[in-house]
Amino acid sequence: MAMKKLLIASLLFSSATVYGAEGFVVKDIHFEGLQRVAVGAALLSMPVRTGDTVNDEDISNTIRALFATGNFEDVRVLRDGDTLLVQVKERPTIASITFSGNKSVKDDMLKQNLEASGVRVGESLDRTTIADIEKGLEDFYYSVGKYSASVKAVVTPLPRNRVDLKLVFQEGVSAEIQQINIVGNHAFTTDELISHFQLRDEVPWWNVVGDRKYQKQKLAGDLETLRSYYLDRGYARFNIDSTQVSLTPDKKGIYVTVNITEGDQYKLSGVEVSGNLAGHSAEIEQLTKIEPGELYNGTKVTKMEDDIKKLLGRYGYAYPRVQSMPEINDADKTVKLRVNVDAGNRFYVRKIRFEGNDTSKDAVLRREMRQMEGAWLGSDLVDQGKERLNRLGFFETVDTDTQRVPGSPDQVDVVYKVKERNTGSFNFGIGYGTESGVSFQAGVQQDNWLGTGYAVGINGTKNDYQTYAELSVTNPYFTVDGVSLGGRLFYNDFQADDADLSDYTNKSYGTDVTLGFPINEYNSLRAGLGYVHNSLSNMQPQVAMWRYLYSMGEHPSTSDQDNSFKTDDFTFNYGWTFNKLDRGYFPTDGSRVNLTGKVTIPGSDNEYYKVTLDTATYVPIDDDHKWVVLGRTRWGYGDGLGGKEMPFYENFYAGGSSTVRGFQSNTIGPKAVYFPYSPNGYDPSNDYACATQDGAKDLCKSDDAVGGNAMAVASLEFITPTPFISDKYANSVRTSFFWDMGTVWDTNWDSSQYSGYPDYSDPSNIRMSAGIALQWMSPLGPLVFSYAQPFKKYDGDKAEQFQFNIGKTW
């Protein structure tokens, strides 16, 4: 048998040699073994055509060309007279790809890696590639500390030369760090140095960052942290000599040893700047000033380089190079910093483009730009455009990319890449409290109507005590200079008694128009006119309410429950907004201040003014803005003019999800004190606690909230990363722990006249609560959950520990 194979091989070789030396003209080309690959596709990949004279080299090139297509496992080329016979064995086609046992790596990520290697459903299977993928995946598991992991590719043949590919994972357990040793440290203790690491050999319960599970990438980051720690404290000669990672025999434990050389501390002796400064030497010199004898600090050096780049970027130098070279003098332990600057070319902006704005029109984004086309590139202007787009609240993310124009030495295109979020919402609110039970509200709002930037809203509330409807439209760019124009129509039918407030009914309707004027990047003013008609009825004889009516020249009856009163008021509305938040929703940095007010103008029945001030400040406490402290306040005050009081229905209220969580909405503050009356045998003592003042008329206390003409609310929140949520959804989910406090009081309450009752003019009756909140921009809409426990409250306050809102967005 062996002799037969040798004979056949010899005959084939001699045959090839014969036509290799003499060559022959190909009259026809035949294929054997083709199944999936078309004959035409195979012919196109071959260098030989019918009519060509071929030799041995041509045959070799043909075989190589067919193998290069990746479609064949075996290729043989034979001669049958004047016919070239090509025998192939096709690689099997991948019919399906499945995964089993992979917990640390998602299926989508595995599919992406396979596709990057050319392994996908419908393509031919290259077994050598599979072996590389197995090894690569195992190396990945090793890098995250799973040294017992294994990956096996299982190939199952199917009919018609197809296969099923299944990757079977056995991940094992992550090796835990048993000990981290630092050798060579004298200035700082090992514990002090390791306290800045992410990887730890011991993790206290309160440390949510530390991790005992070994990961190669985290170790690299920790070594860089160690290097920066020393360089920032003057150790300019610091060096990490070596790092050893040892594995225990059972592959479940890791020992890490870091060998370092600290060196001595060095002080900066000076900074020398050279190179192409593009005429900005004086400004660059200001950025490189140092204090005499200051310790060398690597972070400050890096910041100085970045500041120089930003400075040049503002003048159109898009790609400056700044390199700092420390010149170390070991004799006197000083460092002279030589900074070489090459500003490079100055660039114009050819075009500004937008990507990802499928709904928002280009004009809506372009009007927020401060960088102009055809002008010098200004990195600060580009950044301002990014900030303004973020503050619109239309986008989840905004990124910028400065791209060189091919073939041009001094032109760039600026590209803003946005990811749009749902700006329309249908909100359905639900609250539940131990005393209040269940309450509902609804509203429809579209902040980016048809991509035009218009804000259009139809909001309403329908429940046991209120029917409210509002239509509002705002054009943020009524003029090209950014003057906005907004209008509103509203109707409100309010039954106060059913809302646990002092009993009255108010049917009101009105309208207002407001113009907004931008002052600069962060400040704007508003001014407008409004009209409102109020029709009051069913007013029970309540002290604060009667006090207002008396100031209006009315003389309501304490024996008649059906007191009524109507007013028509015209108001001048004004406001100021300072907004330096980093984005429009879920901000992580910056401040916002909003002042709103109104005052009645001649022709009104009432005479009063009212002012509200809202502030919010976000302070990130880490570089990634995942941990943020939020402080919020709300202040309000109003009073009458010309001897009249501010209407009681304009009072401030507190309590609920937007002010002091844990309390029922609008129930914090003064409570109603009623004059007694007994129509139809009605006995007020059945509903209220009545008392007699010095033998005078009876007064009755209640738990009905009436609000006040002054309010102060504050909140401190600690925003944290949401557990079990990946970074992909970090911009859609927010968790926070909060402490709310607030009070409402009545500055016109005469405590001396009502000495037997609470002093509702006292602003020190502060309510407090603490709890946790979760906000989620879900596919169903914005969801807000909060649970709060009041820990400082007063008689008559009503708790509502759990509150949430749910809505739909589009």
Curated annotation (Swiss-Prot):
Coiled coil: none annotated. Residues 24-91, 92-172, 175-263, 266-344, 347-421 form the POTRA domain. Pfam families: Omp85, POTRA. Its main location: membrane. It comes from the Bacteria. Residues 1-20 form the signal peptide. The keyword Nuclease does not apply. GO terms for biological process: Gram-negative-bacterium-type cell outer membrane assembly; protein insertion into membrane. InterPro entries: Bac_surfAg_D15, BamA/TamA_POTRA, D15-like, OM_assembly_BamA, POTRA. Keywords: Cell outer membrane, Membrane, Repeat, Signal, Transmembrane, Transmembrane beta strand. The keyword Transmembrane applies. HAMAP family: OM_assembly_BamA (MF_01430). Part of the Bam complex, which is composed of the outer membrane protein BamA, and four lipoproteins BamB, BamC, BamD and BamE. Part of the outer membrane protein assembly complex, which is involved in assembly and insertion of beta-barrel proteins into the outer membrane. Constitutes, with BamD, the core component of the assembly machinery. Belongs to the BamA family. This is Outer membrane protein assembly factor BamA. It comes from Escherichia coli (strain SMS-3-5 / SECEC). The gene is bamA.
